[in-house]
Each structure stands twice: as C-alpha cells, then as structure tokens.
Regions:
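Short, flexible loop segments at the rims of nucleotide/cofactor-binding pockets, characterized by
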Residues: 31-33, 55-58
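Single conserved hydrophobic/aromatic residue that forms the stacking wall/gate
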Residues: 1-10
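Short acidic alpha-helix that forms the nucleotide-activated donor recognition element
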Residues: 41-49
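Catalytic binding pocket for nucleotide-activated donors in carbohydrate/polymer assembly enzymes
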Residues: 48-50, 56-197, 201
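Conserved short loop/turn motifs at secondary-structure junctions
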Residues: 1, 34-37, 201-202
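Short acidic loop-to-helix transition motifs that present clustered carboxylates
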Residues: 37-41, 60-63
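Conserved helix-loop functional segments at active or binding sites
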Residues: 18-22, 52, 59
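Nucleotide-activated donor-binding/catalytic signature segment of Leloir-type glycosyltransferases, i.e.
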Residues: 9, 13-40
Length: 202
C-alpha cells in the first residue's frame, strides 16, 4: 500500500543516517539528518541554512510548488530536474546558475506511452547502481534484509499494473551523480558560487 511504501521511505533515510553517522572514518565531515515532521517552522531554518536546493522529482510528476523558490530567494542554487517550478527558476537565473539533470518531461511521457525503458538494463550494466541497490537487501542498512526488499523489487520488477521503476529513478541516477560532481566543483570556486547565490537571490 501507499502507506506501507511511505513508511519504508521514512525508514530508509533513518537507516542510512544511522550507518553514516556512526562511521568513524567520516566523523565530522558529513552527517545525515532526517527531519520527520517537516513543517513551516522547520522549513524556515532549512531555507536559510541550505547551500543547495535539491528538487529531484521525476520530470512531469510534480505539481509546481513554492519551496524551491524559497530556497532560491535565500541564495541556494537549484539541483534538480526540469519539473514544476524548476523550469521557471532556470528561465530566470539561467541554466549556468543551476544544476539540471535527468530525463525531460517529453522523454518520460514517451517512455510511459510507448515503452522502451527497462531498468534491468541499467542495473546489469552500471556497477555503481547495482551496488547501491544491493545495499538495500544485503544488510548494509538493516539487519533485516527483507525490510527494503519491496523497494528493491519495485525498481526492477513489474508487478501487475505497477511498472518497474515507474519514476525512472535508475534512468536519472547517473545524471544525478554527475550533477552532484558539478555542484562540488562549482562550490570550490568561492567567487563563482557567490555569484550563483546572488543571482538566485536577485
């Protein structure tokens, strides 16, 4: 059910946080925090503190909201798909001041209408993606190796009318990882990053 799926989606970041935050080799360098009760009072802190605004819904799937604009107005460049209000943000600040990745809306709709997308091809040819998915079921994030099995299966196996990887997560994964590298390189350029932040605020 959707409620069951949402519960799993809550459990996964909590489990990832537990692993990452207890890894002494990266202590003090990175920390994963999962905010369970996202509300306006929490959002105000996040908008002001963020260096990057990640808006990563699958193109054509997200209603246009205002959260990404609030990040933008606080100087956080957008890392995201061309979906929802991200389209307007890129039009305003320019593609060079955002970090866009993933399938376009037209590509997503074409796959949905005409087929041709098989996440297993990606799984079988991209070792990094395969490793990430295997971590869902090999005990990396939970001693219960079945806890995230349904999530793993949903990405690779069609079940009844539920198409495998219906949100094209594996299709966007490599592009997302590359976008993260672009963010890292841009952030190291302090003046360039400050310019991006100011243009987003303006």
């Amino acid at each position: 059910t959707d409620i069951f799926t949402l519960t799993l989606h809550d459990a996964l970041p909590i489990s990832v946080a537990d692993v990452v935050n207890n890894d002494t080799s990266i202590n003090g360098k990175i920390k994963v925090v999962f905010i369970e009760n996202y509300r306006v009072s929490n959002a105000e802190w996040i908008f002001a503190a963020a260096d990057v605004s990640e808006q990563i819904s699958t193109a054509s799937k997200e209603a246009s909201g205002t959260g990404n604009m609030k990040f933008m107005l606080n100087g956080a460049p957008t890392l995201g798909t061309m979906d929802g209000a991200n389209v307007e943000i890129v039009e305003e600040v320019g593609a060079e001041n955002a970090f866009i990745f993933g399938l376009s809306s037209d590509e997503v709709i074409n796959y949905e209408n005409n087929g041709g997308y098989d996440p297993n091809v990606i799984y079988n040819t991209d070792e990094e993606i395969r490793q990430v998915l295997m971590q869902l079921i090999n005990g990396t994030f939970s001693n219960d190796t079945e806890l995230f099995r349904d999530l793993y299966d949903s990405l690779l196996n069609t079940k009844n009318t539920d198409r495998a990887d219906r949100y094209f997560i594996l299709a966007d994964f490599r592009s997302y990882a590359d976008a993260q590298k672009r963010v890292e390189a841009a952030y190291r350029d302090e003046k360039g990053w400050a310019k991006k932040a100011l243009l987003n605020t303006a």
